[in-house]
Amino acid sequence: MSATSIQPLLDILFQGKALTREQTASLFSTLIQGEMNEAVMAGMLMALKIRGETIAEISGAADAMRAAAKPFPYPSSKRTEGIIDIVGTGGDGFNTINISTTAAFVAAAAGAKVAKHGNRSVSSKSGSSDLLAQFGIDLTMSPELASRCLESLNLCFLFAPHYHGGVKHAVPVRQALKTRTLFNVLGPLINPARPEFMLLGVYSPELVTPIARVLQALGTQRAMVVHGSGLDEVALHGSTQVAELKDGEIIEYQLTPADFGVPQAQISELEGGEPAQNAQITQSILQGQGSDAHTHAVAINAGCALYLCGLSDSVKAGTALALNTIKSGKAFELLNQLAKVSSETQE
């Protein structure tokens, strides 16, 4: 769309009115094609933020991003097995270990098909991609190879900038604004593998139910949107607020560590460090040699993923399966297999 054709949509926004899903998709399509002036982009993002984005607007922005993404070739088993993503928005302000990334290895080793969509760090010193790079896993592997990894190993990692090139047009504006915008919640919603199941952590409790409603609008089959006592994941140090999407309905409830069959820990016990240090922590957990707090934090998140996939009938049973999978060494073996496949492609 040209500058003149988007002006009526901007006028609606600047009057404090909401856009439809289709109108928002048109605006974001213009943005990611590099056809939006930076001043206009800043005005649009701030108008949305100040009024508060609607479910339709978040869904429309996600529609545009998904449509423009580099395609992901589905593996043949995709026809019968659903894919899950274990992902957080980041930006929760805590520098924890890489819980969701480590949980992805555990869930995959336990039988889930995990396509994890990740980026570099938002709130910690080490994001999903920072950690994987430490293990020699190629972040820019082709979509075809990623699909083969998902098929043969039950796991692949999709590096967001590799699939969503158009986001680069928003970087200068986002950096200049120095405040959260719609982009802070879009990342988890635009996985190019289009997972049927999602465990999605958000940085604010106010986002839990709205983001569940967005996933519902986007056609996600089953999901848990969680905020865990300050963290964008299931909490070991306190209660977790949940909005679960199941059979087209959203149910809201809270979970505590006792619901998973594990003891509560202090948030300080989950503090992470630089990528190299976090890689060592992840390796220890996957080898069955992690601290109780580290191991349990990973297991309760993997347990929720296994519950969502239908591999366990409760989050407690899922956690037990995750702990047994860690103990078996299968998750660490999977890490080595993925690193090996990745290194072979780089030679």
Swiss-Prot record:
Keyword annotations from UniProtKB, A to Z: Amino-acid biosynthesis, Aromatic amino acid biosynthesis, Glycosyltransferase, Magnesium, Metal-binding, Transferase, Tryptophan biosynthesis
HAMAP family per record: TrpD
GO BP annotation list: L-tryptophan biosynthetic process
Described function: Catalyzes the transfer of the phosphoribosyl group of 5-phosphorylribose-1-pyrophosphate (PRPP) to anthranilate to yield N-(5'-phosphoribosyl)-anthranilate (PRA).
Annotated positions binding Mg(2+) 2: 232-233
Membership in a protein family: Belongs to the anthranilate phosphoribosyltransferase family.
Pathway linked to the protein: Amino-acid biosynthesis; L-tryptophan biosynthesis; L-tryptophan from chorismate: step 2/5
Catalytic activity: N-(5-phospho-beta-D-ribosyl)anthranilate + diphosphate = 5-phospho-alpha-D-ribose 1-diphosphate + anthranilate
Annotated Pfam families: Glycos_trans_3N, Glycos_transf_3
Encoding gene per record: trpD
Protein name from the UniProt record: Anthranilate phosphoribosyltransferase
Xref: PANTHER family: ANTHRANILATE PHOSPHORIBOSYLTRANSFERASE
Residues where anthranilate 2 binds: 174
Chain positions recorded as anthranilate 1 binding sites: 88, 119
Native organism taxonomy: Bacteria, Pseudomonadati, Pseudomonadota, Gammaproteobacteria, Alteromonadales
Cofactor remark: Binds 2 magnesium ions per monomer.
Binding of Mg(2+) 1, residues: 100, 233
Gene Ontology cellular-component annotations: cytosol
GO molecular function annotations of the record: anthranilate phosphoribosyltransferase activity; magnesium ion binding
EC number in record: 2.4.2.18
